Amino acid sequence: MNARLAVAPTVGLRARRPLAPLPAAADALGGAPSAPSSTASPATKLYPNLDLDFVPVMTPAEWARGLALAVFTGALHAAFVAKLFTQRLTGGSSPWYVTVAPTLAVAVLTFAIHRYLALEEKEQRRLVSETDAADPDSLFTNVDDVTVHYKLRRPKKGPPRVVVSCCHGFGANTYSWERCAMSPLAEALGAAVVAHDSPGFGLTARPTDLSKYLPKTNGAISRAMLDVASVAYQSMEQRTVPQSPFPKPRRVVMGHSMGGIAAAVAAGAGDVDDVVLVAPALIPPRLGVKPNLNPNPKPVSLMTALCGALGRFATAVAVYALAPFLKLFLRKIVRSATFWRRGLSKAVGRRCAPVFFTDLTWADGYRRPSCVKGWDDGMVRVVLAAATAGVNDVWAAESAKVAAAMRKESPAVDAPEDMSTDAAATLEALRCSGARVLIVHGDEDAIVPLENSRRLADALGPEAQLVVMRGCGHMPHEEDPDVFVEAVKEFVGEWNPRPTVRAKKP
């Protein structure tokens, strides 16, 4: 392996500072939240103004109306069948099963529709806007026609020497960074640290354009957050000023899990000094092989390209057709505290699992977006974009492969711009960007295998460094932020000497 490898020990779980619940209000410019509690109760409410456990139920009057509608429509259907289909077609009475079975089906369907509409009305009434669900330290800005929610932390003293943009993983939001890592990173690096919600998650807007949910858009947002962080030391009223009187700080992008794809895309566009990938999902486990970074790969056969085009187009159609059912399924699981407690406890290492399961504030931090209007539509669009990249984008990409196969050329030659978010092209752009890469991975990660990061570090070459955190699972920056911050500080500090040293030079 060409990359450097380091193994970070894990300190005792009980001694860790960040296991205390995060207060709803924190100082956006000053760094750490004020007066955090040292213990967390399972009954602690992180967002007392939001009804995270709301479950819509029908009132007795609504039940009565539903049953009455079911009986009425069933009777109408029975009369319709008896008169139009039986007497006119056969001249006699119909068997009971010809009338009763369809009538019952119509009655049940009518009641189901009534129940859905009644519960949907209650569901929509309890949802709030992104700004109503925001924290006092929440900030919003517009990037590429998307209103992006983000959190900001900066060092308590002096202008930032480093600016950091953090991208969360699938199903998460800024909470995964702000609870444990943002303030310590700001102090350790002397950095302005920004974490944003990706489109479809958290409190960021959920546009109808599926291209806004692709990694290229999230990468553009990550780069925009670097610009926001660059002027973070100014007053909040002047944070949008495009220029700073201070020298340009070092630019760092971080990405956890699927957020690592956005971080890699952001760095691949250039003007990024360091990249920190935390349990990155850049190389899917199903591939089982090293990514092909050859800019001129072996041409794809015509049959393979055609099958791929038809397969992805069929997938797009199927996902669109199943979207309403997917929304109902997401509502069932995402709002459940039990779902998050079990999921988070399985995602982390063995020693952290009891804390993530018993402390309800962790689950609340992840499921808060389920109180925002349109959150389920956003999740469906995320899945649609991931599965199809949009029907038009799928067809364009696969058509390019077919055309290249017919010419017996490399598909990479004529691939559209969206194909740059493919793993191979993204990694190639990252490798050629000149940015140094730190990969942090827990040795108990059950979601993204550690071997994936080993192969990724090997593929990126000597500029990549792999740090393995013992006893951590898929979320090492949340499980052991002290060790994580120390690893990042050592990595960034190698090329970022303190400004006081540089100031002494004439």
Where are these regions (language model features)?
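Catalytic active-site module of serine/aspartate enzymes centered on a nucleophile-bearing elbow/loop
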Residues: 454-455, 462-506
